[in-house]
């Protein structure tokens, strides 16, 4: 599968079976995450792999069925004290987290593991549950697993190239 086929295949899955993610697939996904670039190579992220009881405790943090069904969830945190800031003090932590998250969801798609990129959750409750240090902010949740067989993948609706690209000479 080439890269375009991979990005066309990947979608946000919100329902999961109880089937666990194979350890070798998770290892591959995490190796791909490790290779993600970051501003000035700061790598201001940490990845928490949640399964079992701690995953059940996440249910109130993101109140959708996703956490009740997904057999695993990754929590991607960013450390704003470690991230690069450009000359005007713009913090690139969230940008770096987006890059590592995209590496994760695409590597998962390559292995046939379904994911959903979640940012709308109770950040403080997540931080408390995981007992994170003050400088570490939970930025992304990635429920992971396998879609039920009856899942219909929705058609992707994207703007035309002409709407998003301008050539300047």
Give, region by region, the residue ranges found by the protein language model.
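Glycine/small-residue-rich phosphate/adenosyl-binding loop
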Residues: 25-31, 35-100
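Residue-level "edge-of-site" marker
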Residues: 46, 121, 140
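Short hydrophobic alpha-helices that are characteristic scaffold elements of the AMP-binding
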Residues: 106-109
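GST superfamily/GST-like fold recognition
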Residues: 113-125
